[in-house]
């Protein structure tokens, strides 16, 4: 019998979540099968995933029509659809949540991307989503923007599970884990239990390589006379995201060894795990599981789209690699400053955050528009 590498990865301390959710996979039993037999122990969703699930799918039409008859505005109809899917997915994952002592079994749902730069609106929506969905194993996604992190701190203090999303730079990750720590400290100071709260920090991968590879390709296209310069550029291609992630993991290790974290751990606090996101390979020249193989290790999560789950189950090469090649990772990131390469990684990360928010705003607005069209069709004349 062939080895299912997804189950093998779990033995190295990494949880595999799925970056996909739709009513189809819930009702068909596919999600239940993935959870019970394939080792999937969490779900992440985002506005792009919901647009794909809902926009051209008749499975939602009866609920849309019910919302129209009830006189609900389009946005409330949208929420009724996604909240129902989130609740059902939470129920399927509840046994995992219980069996893992609340480490896994979460379903992530993002606050509206249109409020990414509004702290108070993010806090309000996170509270409302958590209360209205009404499942302990729901995890609210909050973008790791300057405005998002104070919201993370506050909702953690209130006992809400948080997935901090759209993290690209190591510094943004460091800021995120400290926001989590401050939230726990605030909750502890109020005499409340901190042992039941979970959080992950979603660190994005493939988008970094797409951006930097594009810059390298542009340099190569302009022509490079020196063979050694061409070699320098080629060494960087497809390597920056993984190097960046390995450095972030080193920062994680430093922080959890600190006295400040150890004081919280003594009270039962769960570590905020790094979650590798954007893990499907976009370049056909790269391995379709490279963002899995290279980042397996303790206290991590990898959220995979369905195609990558299938590929990984088939041919991942499972080993603890998140802590290998660390010196080389630092060297690679440092090499971007070389005048011959001259890529400002901080500028790239800032660019990717702005782009990342837009990539969620656009499908969110597109879905609102398509829902509005359905609402008009189904409304009584």
Curated annotation (Swiss-Prot):
CDD domains listed in its UniProt record: Transaldolase_like
Matches recorded under InterPro entries: Aldolase_TIM (IPR013785), TAL/FSA (IPR001585), Transaldolase_2 (IPR004732), Transaldolase_AS (IPR018225)
GO-annotated cellular components: cytoplasm
Enzyme class: transferase
Main location: cytoplasm
Alphabetic keyword roster: Cytoplasm, Pentose shunt, Schiff base, Transferase
Active-site residues from the entry: 141 (schiff-base intermediate with substrate)
Listed GO biological process terms: carbohydrate metabolic process; pentose-phosphate shunt
Name used for this protein in its record: Transaldolase 2
């Amino acid at each position: 019998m062939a080895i299912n590498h997804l189950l093998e990865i779990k033995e190295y301390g990494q949880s595999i979540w799925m970056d996909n959710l739709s009513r189809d996979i819930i009702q068909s039993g596919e999600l239940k099968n993935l959870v019970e037999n394939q080792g999937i122990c969490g779900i992440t969703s985002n506005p792009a995933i919901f647009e794909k699930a809902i926009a051209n799918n008749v499975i939602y039409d009866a609920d849309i029509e019910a919302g129209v008859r009830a006189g609900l505005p389009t946005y409330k109809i949208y929420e009724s659809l996604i909240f129902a899917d989130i609740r059902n997915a939470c129920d399927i994952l509840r046994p995992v949540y219980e069996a893992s002592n609340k480490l896994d079994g979460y379903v992530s749902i993002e606050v509206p991307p249109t409020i990414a730069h509004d702290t108070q609106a993010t806090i309000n929506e996170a509270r409302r989503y958590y209360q209205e969905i009404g499942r302990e194993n729901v995890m609210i996604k909050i973008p790791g923007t300057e405005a998002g992190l104070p919201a993370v701190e506050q909702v953690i203090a209130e006992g809400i599970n948080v997935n901090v999303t759209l993290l690209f730079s190591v510094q943004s990750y460091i800021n995120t884990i400290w926001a989590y720590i401050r939230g726990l400290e605030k909750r502890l100071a109020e005499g409340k239990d901190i042992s039941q709260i979970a959080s992950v920090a979603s660190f994005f991968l493939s988008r970094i390589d797409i951006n930097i590879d594009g810059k390298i390709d542009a340099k190569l296209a302009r022509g490079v006379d020196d063979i050694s310069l061409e070699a320098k550029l080629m060494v960087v291609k497809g390597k920056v995201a993984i190097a960046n992630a390995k450095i972030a993991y080193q920062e994680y290790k430093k922080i959890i060894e600190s006295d400040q974290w150890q004081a919280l751990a003594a009270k039962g606090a769960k570590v905020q795990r790094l979650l590798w996101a954007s893990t499907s390979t976009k370049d056909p020249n790269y391995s379709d599981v490279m963002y899995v193989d290279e980042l397996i290790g303790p206290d991590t999560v990898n959220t995979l789209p369905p195609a990558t789950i299938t590929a990984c189950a088939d041919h991942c090469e499972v080993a603890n690699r998140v802590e290998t090649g660390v010196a080389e990772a630092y060297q690679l990131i440092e090499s971007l400053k070389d005048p011959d390469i001259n890529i400002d990684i901080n500028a790239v990360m800032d660019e990717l955050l702005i782009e990342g928010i837009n990539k969620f705003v656009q499908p969110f607005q597109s879905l609102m528009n398509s829902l509005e069209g359905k609402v008009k069709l189904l409304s009584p004349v």
